Amino acid sequence: MPARICSTVAAAAMAAMIAMPASAGDFRLTSPDMPDGRMPAAQVLSAAYGFGCDGDNRSPALTWEGAPAGTRSFVLTVHDPDAPTGIGWTHWVVANIPADAQGLDTGASGNAARLPAGAVETRTDFGLPGYGGACPPEGREHRYVFTLTALGMEALPVATPEAMPALIGFFANAHALDKAVLEVRYGR
């Protein structure tokens, strides 16, 4: 895809994500691993990534309820809008989560047996598919926004392990029925 088209798709995806408000209804996303709104060490990036953090890099458990009528699948994204990149940092993308799923288990990332059947983890801003935990610069606290988007289609045909976050965001927003948002914080 030419660079100009990629830039256009990325800009459109970001605009669509910002333009759609979080749900004011019954659609809710929660995490038993982060009940106080703080990200514990288990969900922080591991030393192996070379960013200076020393967590377990384990994806958190998430549960949801109240999805809108007509939901046929979900997309989950985890984004740090405070990352010093100018556009934030995407830490996790899971697409094609079946409509009958009610959550994800702790440590589901990277373990197909723990993800709902048909779910696909796509690339993140780490350049690989799967969960990459929080690791803000020292002395800074960042927000980590978990967004579950209910879709009116069964699967995003562009959802492959190689798909970039902006591509998934663009198509998810084009088919979004509603969103549930959970914001947690982490600083070091």
Which residues fall in each region the model found?
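Bacterial N-terminal signal peptides
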Residues: V9-A19
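N-terminus-centered regions that define maturation/targeting leaders and the start
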Residues: A22-R188
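Absolute N-terminal positional cue centered near the fourth residue
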Residues: R4, M17-S23
